[in-house]
């Protein structure tokens, strides 16, 4: 039974220390003494543990980020997620349930009644009183679910009126502003930011400004972008859906567009789709017939071209890519691998850096089209690329993956690159920029003036932000895991 309790905690992402194991063991031993308590408490509890175990052994206990991701995930992503869990993980539920039933069978058959041993019960009580709880898994799960549920209720029930008021434009140079959001693209896996293999020929050489030092608002798409695309509460790291990026741009009388390969509008609005829905025009590849398809980011290019050619009005276009989303090998089914890797251990990293190469080519194609339009019709433009968050390494069955199974010191490091129709030189800035100031940076880039915006803030001044709002302390408290990018050259 000791080993079953240890397995339960390990698979729930809870530290299986001897103390925690004995606490869970005490709970099971006492409750199993009663037939009703076993069937109505122990069995349901262990069933929930076992169901989560294939995932928990890799990703740890549930939290806001993971629960929010579930609400924001479509059928295809769930299917991909489950197929990439190692087969051996699916045996853990069998081991857990079998262990519980074998223990129950043993004590019933041998008529063992621990509850009659008062000395043993006293020891159990004293040991249990010294803090810690085997119910931590359920506390974390319930708290995370309620937090996400409450946010979804807010997003779906109120008409999120804008609190920006009126904005005006000042030194707004371009006719078209294009914001490209990459997915799960860690900065140090870009050649433009130092990775040895040249998987970013466009960003590495094109005229523009490369900013080395931007940090994300969170460790996954929802937790990051809900802060970066609103004017957040800096102290508590909470979004403000009354002050969204789209509402800010619209307050300056700029036409807004949102093009995405990140899923469709479902029954529930996620924080990101709620922001996207505020746009004047929305287009999602994974909607209707695309529901179950692994769609390529390149399919967005034709829609962008259509929008640019359709009118001459000033436009703000958000392009949300699928990029290097988890299970990166599925992202490059239609694309060449950038390296020849013989060692299976590094095969996934090859997929990952190839997916970044694919994103770089997307940017190159988009920029080439915009330059042609500028040459023909004088439609000036500026294109800004960043990624929502990074990933961490995790070795499973002899293969090194990149996913959100843990938090890395490099998890929040993301790329930022800007180019435009009048970029005549190349500049690189090495300066810390907090993702929580992102909306101020976007406003400066476009030339939007608003009393709620810091008019002096800029992505491109090569100056460090004075405050990281606790990010460094948070990373220091949550992880000591350092996992720099792995060079797969010659592997």
Where does each model-flagged region fall?
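Histidine-centered active-site microenvironments of extracellular/periplasmic hydrolases
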Residues: 194-198, 377-421
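Membrane-interface soluble catalytic domains
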Residues: 1, 9-17, 32-40, 50, ...
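Transmembrane and membrane-interface helices of multi-pass
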Residues: 1-141
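Active-site-proximal alpha/beta segments of enzymes that process anionic O-linked groups
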Residues: 134-339, 413, 435-467, 472-475, ...
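Short glycine/proline-rich turn/loop motifs
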Residues: 227, 340-348, 420-424
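A long, amphipathic alpha-helix that forms part
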Residues: 28, 152-166, 302-306, 340-383
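Short beta-strand segments
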Residues: 258-260, 316-323, 353-359, 382-387, ...
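Long, structured stretches of catalytic cores involved in phosphate-ester chemistry, encompassing
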Residues: 363-365, 387, 433
């Amino acid at each position: 039974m000791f080993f079953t309790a240890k397995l339960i905690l390990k698979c729930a992402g809870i530290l299986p220390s001897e103390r925690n194991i004995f606490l869970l063991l005490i709970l099971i031993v006492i409750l199993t003494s009663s037939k009703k308590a076993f069937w109505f408490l122990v069995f349901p509890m262990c069933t929930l543990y076992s169901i989560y175990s294939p995932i928990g052994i890799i990703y740890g206990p549930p939290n806001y980020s993971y629960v929010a991701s579930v609400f924001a995930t479509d059928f295809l992503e769930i299917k991909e997620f489950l197929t990439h869990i190692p087969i051996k993980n699916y045996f853990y539920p069998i081991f857990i349930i079998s262990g519980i039933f074998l223990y129950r069978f043993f004590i019933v058959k041998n008529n063992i009644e621990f509850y009659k041993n008062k000395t043993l019960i006293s020891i159990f009580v004293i040991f249990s009183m010294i803090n810690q709880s085997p119910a931590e898994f359920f506390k974390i799960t319930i708290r995370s679910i309620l937090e996400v549920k409450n946010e979804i209720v807010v997003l779906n029930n109120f008409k999120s009126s804008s609190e920006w008021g009126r904005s005006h434009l000042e030194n707004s140079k371009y006719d078209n502003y294009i914001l490209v959001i990459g997915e799960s693209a860690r900065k140090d896996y870009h050649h433009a930011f130092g990775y040895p293999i040249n998987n970013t020929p466009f960003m590495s050489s094109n005229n523009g400004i490369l900013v080395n030092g931007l940090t994300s608002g969170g460790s996954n798409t929802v937790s990051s972008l809900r802060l970066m695309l609103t004017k957040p509460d800096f102290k508590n790291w909470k979004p403000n859906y009354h002050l969204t990026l789209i509402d800010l741009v619209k307050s300056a009388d700029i036409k807004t567009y949102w093009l995405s390969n990140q899923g469709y509008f479902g029954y529930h609005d996620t924080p990101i789709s709620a922001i996207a829905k505020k746009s004047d025009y929305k287009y999602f590849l994974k909607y209707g017939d695309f529901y179950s398809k692994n769609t390529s980011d390149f399919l967005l290019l034709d829609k962008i071209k259509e929008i640019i050619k359709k009118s001459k009005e000033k436009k703000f276009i958000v392009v949300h890519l699928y990029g290097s989303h988890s299970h990166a090998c599925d992202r490059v089914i239609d694309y060449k691998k950038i390296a020849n890797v013989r060692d299976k251990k590094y095969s996934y990293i090859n997929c990952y850096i190839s997916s970044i190469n694919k994103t770089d080519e997307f940017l190159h194609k988009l920029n080439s089209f915009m330059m042609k339009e500028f040459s023909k019709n004088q439609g000036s433009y500026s294109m800004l690329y960043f990624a929502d968050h990074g990933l961490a390494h995790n070795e499973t069955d002899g293969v090194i993956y990149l996913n959100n199974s843990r938090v890395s010191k490099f998890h929040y490091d993301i790329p930022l690159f800007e180019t435009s129709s009048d970029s005549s030189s190349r500049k690189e800035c090495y300066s810390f920029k907090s993702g929580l100031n992102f909306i101020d940076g976007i406003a400066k880039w476009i030339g939007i003036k608003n009393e709620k915006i810091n008019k002096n803030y800029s992505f491109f001044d090569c100056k460090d932000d004075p405050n990281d709002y606790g990010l460094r302390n948070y990373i220091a408290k949550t992880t000591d895991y350092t996992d720099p990018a792995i060079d797969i050259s010659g592997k």
